[in-house]
Structure formats: C-alpha cells, structure tokens
C-alpha cells in the first residue's frame, strides 16, 4: 500500500487522520513522533487514574502513559525504532562532552542572587560575552527534571487549554532520512506546563479584549481589523472589572500559588497586581508601533490615551480641571519617560512574544523583592519557580530556533529589572497624586490591591517625599494668604520625633540639637529677627493641612475678622529671641 493511500485511514492510536505505516502500525505523524521519542529517551510514564484514559486528537497529550500503552496495543514495535544518527560523531560521546563542560561550569560558578532573579548552573556553551556574564552573575540553568508540582496538579488544570505539543516536522519513517538536530526537543512535563501557560496567556488576553466588544464590533473586527478609539473616562469602570477578573484568572494558573498559606497568597496577590497590570499594558501598547511613535498609549480595550491626556480624567472634569491635571502630570514625567524609553520601545524593537511575557509574569510573581512579605517556606518555593521559569524560557528559545538565545535571554533579564523599578516609581507617584487629590481610585479595586500599603511604602525610595510635599503645600498656602512674614535663617532646638517618622530618626549620637529653620520677622526688612511664641515655635506646618481649625492661630485675619480674637503669634522685639 502506497503512503498516499493511508491518508484516508485513521490513526490506530488517537483516531486522527493517518500519515502512514510507522513502526508496524498505521498512525499519524504526532503519535509517530511521540512513540519514537519515548523509546529513544527511555521515558517512563505513570497514569494518575485507572490506565483507561481516552486517547483522541483533542486529549492525546493528557496521559502519556495510556497513549504509549495504546501505541503498543496498536502494533508499534519498539525494536523498529532506530537511535538518532549524528553525522558529527557519537551522540553518546557528545553528551558526555557536554556533561563535562556542565560539571566544570557548576564547579566554577556558584548560584547567586541578583535583583531578585536567580539562576542555577549548567547551560548551553557559547563564546558570547553576555553568556559568560550571566553565568558569572547568576549561575545559569539546572538540568531538567520531572516536575512533581505539575504532574500532581488537579485535572482541572489540563482542561482549560488544548494544545498539541508533538506535531513537529518529523520525517516519516517510511520515506526520507531523519532530519538531524543538535538539540533534543524538550518534551517533559515541565516544558509542557510552560507551553500550556503560553497558550493560556494568549487565550486570557483575547478573552479580556472580547469582554469590551459588542457583537457589531466583533463582526467588524473580523472584516476590517480592530479599530481603536480615544479612551473615555467612563471606560475606567468597565476596565477595572475586566482586569480584576483577568488578574484572578491568571494568578490561579500559577503553580503552586493555590497551595500556599492564605496570608502569603494575599501578600503575593497585592504585590503582583500592580506588576501584572503594568506589564499587560506595556505589552498591549508595544503591539501598536505607529501609536507608540506618537506617544499614544494603547490599552487592551481597543482604546488609546492621547499624548495630551493623562488617563486620570474623570467624566465630570471641566476644561480647567483637565488642563490642571495635564500640568500636574509633569510631576510624573520621570516614570512616564522611563517606561516609554526602557520598556515599551525595547518591546517594539525586539518584537517580544507571548512566551517571553509569560516568563516576565512568572518572575514578577515570584520575585525576590516579595521575600519580606511571605514566610520562609514560601521563599523557597519562589526561588524554585524562578529557576524553573528561566530554564523553561531558554528551552523554549532552543525549541523554536530563536537566534542567539543567550543574548535574547540577557535582554529579558534587563527588562525585568526595569519593570520592577517602574512599578515602584508608579506606586510612589500614586501617593503624590492621592495627596493632591489628583485622582480618586477609592471606588475601584486598584486602591485595595495595587496600591495596598505593601506597594506604597515609599520610605525606601525617598523617606522625606511626603513630608516635604506637605510642608511645601502648607507654607505655600500660608504665604499666599499673608500668614507668614519674610524669612530669615536662625537656629532653634527641635525635637526629632516631631519632624521625623520613627523609621527615619537618626541615632542619638548623630543628632544635632540645633538645626537651621526659617523664622518670620517683622515686615520692616531692616529690623532684627523676632522670636516666635514658644508654644507655636515647633508647630509642624504640615499639621495645618489636616487641622484647619488651627489656621486662625497662625494666619493673618481677613477684613471681616477684625474683631476676631486670636493668640499672638509674634512677640515684640523686646522679648527674648530664641537662638
């Protein structure tokens, strides 16, 4: 029977259209590849059920044990499988040489952690300087092993996605010689888990997009492609609902997140939420280079934020409020400029794909920067997952023929650090915006998760940021209302507890009892400095922002307050001057 005559028959293993007679049985190309790899690699599988799993075109990857058993029952002969032919030398000897290099690398490079991302040792050899740098700094890649986390995960994890991993171009055993490959195809359960995540991420992004579409838009998109429109303030409500659902769906996919203690899950959810949304937005924007060139930020809901808008506009804002927000937005220019220059533009130039974004998501969720918020046992799990993600991405590069995988991998690590930093800067910006009532997120979930205290603790960035802003605001208000006289410099004794938070108080040995402060003097520029009322000398101007009832004690009276009695703030020059 000729090969073409088998096309009308079904595979005796999975019932898919047959490709020919392979190893003694009529089978499809996928089952042919699966059977051959299992025999060559001497793989052993174990069914998690009763060894009666259904093997069909949709579910043939669900249970490898039952699939291999059915191959044998269909008549495939193990003895008919030939070992890989290597024209450059013995495959066995080459593996020994590769193993020797790996052992030398593991002895010379101990695993280190840097910026929250750790590598193990033993990776592909290369003369590239970046590979050597990565190995030296991180200690690269461990040998693959079977993942007990994934193999023991509930069956519901497998049912969400259907992806065939065995459909690769393996030549038929009945015709042309085998195509040689220097790299064995990664096909263990760990790589399958990563491929499932990549597939699920694409489905997840598409489902979020469809949540914003009407059926008219859906039909028009298939005919004319997606149409983008300017973002409207009313879009925020719908966007928040869809993004919350997407966040919970995606984090549930991450193994073994569901098995962690509830306190650790809560902390990781809050820490990851702002990073997940930021990365999704960066990735969505990078898919539209023409909009990026104009400085227009494309969102996942088929809208874009124009260059002359901030994205914080509310439905009832008038033109003056919109202009004011635009002016205030300059405060956040460092953050905006950084993510445009250091994240979105590289995403566009590199044409970052779903697999790389999945890798970044995994690294952000299990980042070492989250260690202080979880238990010791969870920290160990997080390190394992970071190592797992790095190995999986490198295998994915090799499997898909990526040009210069070590260089590409190094670029992704650099992007990871930038995204972490930008998310921290964004959370600090939110604190400033909230202080000046620049935006109100209280009715959305963003403030509960994304801007939770574990994300908005800015003391490690600028301990005096909020304090300085409050002081500046209070003093500016008082100056504008005539409540303060011109300033001269003098020294008064201060209580450090009054001017600093407990976290930033210096040791007593380093504290200077006398510090330079501004003291108002009389309006006559030639008069000597006058002293302040001792009861008010140490009042923090920031207190006035939150205690409006104290303003009459420190501000000049208005014209209609002429008879209003208030305590004297300034004494005459004959009184004692504080120095």
Swiss-Prot record:
Where are the residues of the annotated region Disordered? 82-124, 168-189
Q: Compositional bias (Polar residues) spans?
A: 106-124, 171-186
Q: Pfam families, from UniProt?
A: Hormone_recep, zf-C4
UniProt xrefs under CDD domains? NR_DBD_HNF4A (cd06960)
As annotated, the DNA-binding region falls at 8-83
**A GO CC term?**
nucleus
Q: Which GO terms describe its biological process?
A: regulation of transcription by RNA polymerase II
Sorted UniProt keywords: DNA-binding, Metal-binding, Nucleus, Receptor, Transcription, Transcription regulation, Zinc, Zinc-finger
What are the NR LBD domain coordinates in residue numbering?
A: 189-452
Where does this polypeptide localize?
Nucleus
Q: Where are the zinc fingers (NR C4-type)?
A: 11-31, 47-71
Q: Which GO terms describe its molecular function?
A: DNA-binding transcription factor activity; RNA polymerase II cis-regulatory region sequence-specific DNA binding; zinc ion binding
Q: What does this protein do?
A: Orphan nuclear receptor.
The record's comment on protein family reads: Belongs to the nuclear hormone receptor family.
What is the protein name stated in its UniProt record? Nuclear hormone receptor family member nhr-71
């Amino acid at each position: 029977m000729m090969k073409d005559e088998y096309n009308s028959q079904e595979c005796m293993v999975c019932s898919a259209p047959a490709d020919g007679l392979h190893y003694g049985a009529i089978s499809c190309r996928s089952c042919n590849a699966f059977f051959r790899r299992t025999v060559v690699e001497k793989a052993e599988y174990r069914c998690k059920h009763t060894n009666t799993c259904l093997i069909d075109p949709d579910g043939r990857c669900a249970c490898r044990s039952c699939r291999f058993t059915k191959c044998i029952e269909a008549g495939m002969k193990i003895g008919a499988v030939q070992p890989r032919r290597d024209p450059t030398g013995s495959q066995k000897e080459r593996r020994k040489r590769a193993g020797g290099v790996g052992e030398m690398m593991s002895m010379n490079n101990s695993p280190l952690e840097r910026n929250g991302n750790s590598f193990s040792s033993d990776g592909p050899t290369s003369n590239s300087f970046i590979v050597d740098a990565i190995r030296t700094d991180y200690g690269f890649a461990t040998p693959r092993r079977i993942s007990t986390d994934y193999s023991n995960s509930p069956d519901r994890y497998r049912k969400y996605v259907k992806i065939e991993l065995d459909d690769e171009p393996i030549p038929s055993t009945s015709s042309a010689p085998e195509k040689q490959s220097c790299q064995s195809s990664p096909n263990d359960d760990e790589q399958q888990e990563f491929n499932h995540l990549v597939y699920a991420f694409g489905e997840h992004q598409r489902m979020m997009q469809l949540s914003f579409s009407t059926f008219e838009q859906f039909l028009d998109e298939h005919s004319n492609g997606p149409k983008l429109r300017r973002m409207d303030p009313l879009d925020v409500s719908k966007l928040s609902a869809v993004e919350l659902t997407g966040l919970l769906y995606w984090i549930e996919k991450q193994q073994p997140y569901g098995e962690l203690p509830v306190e650790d899950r809560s902390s990781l959810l809050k820490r990851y939420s702002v990073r997940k949304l930021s990365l999704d937005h960066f990735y969505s924007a990078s898919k539209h280079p023409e909009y990026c060139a104009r400085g227009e930020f494309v969102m996942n809901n088929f809208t874009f934020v124009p260059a002359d808008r901030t994205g914080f506009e509310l439905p009832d804002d008038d033109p003056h409020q919109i202009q004011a927000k635009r002016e205030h937005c300059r405060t956040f220019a460092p953050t905006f400029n950084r993510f445009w220059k250091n994240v979105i533009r590289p995403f566009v130039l590199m044409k970052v794909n779903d697999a790389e974004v999945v890798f970044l998501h995994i690294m952000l969720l299990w980042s070492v920067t989250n260690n202080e918020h979880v238990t010791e046992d969870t920290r160990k799990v997080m390190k394992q997952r970071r190592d797992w993600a790095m190995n999986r991405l490198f295998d994915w590069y090799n499997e898909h023929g990526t040009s210069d995988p070590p260089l590409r991998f190094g670029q992704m690590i650099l992007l990871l650090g930038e995204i972490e930093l930008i998310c921290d800067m964004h959370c600090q910006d939110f604190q400033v915006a909230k202080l000046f009532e620049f935006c109100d997120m209280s009715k959305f979930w963003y403030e509960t998760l994304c801007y939770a205290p574990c994300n908005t603790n800015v003391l490690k960035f600028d301990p005096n940021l909020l304090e300085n802003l409050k002081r500046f605001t209070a003093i500016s208000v008082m100056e504008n209302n005539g409540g303060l006289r011109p300033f001269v410099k003098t020294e008064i004794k201060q209580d450090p507890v009054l001017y600093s938070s407990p976290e930033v108080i210096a040791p007593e040995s380093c504290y200077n009892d006398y510090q330079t402060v501004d003291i108002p003097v009389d309006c006559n520029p030639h008069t000597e400095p006058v002293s302040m009322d001792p009861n008010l000398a140490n009042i923090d101007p920031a207190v006035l922002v939150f205690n409006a009832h104290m303003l009459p004690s420190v501000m000049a009276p208005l014209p209609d307050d002429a008879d209003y009695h208030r305590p004297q703030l300034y004494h005459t020059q004959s009184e004692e001057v504080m120095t």
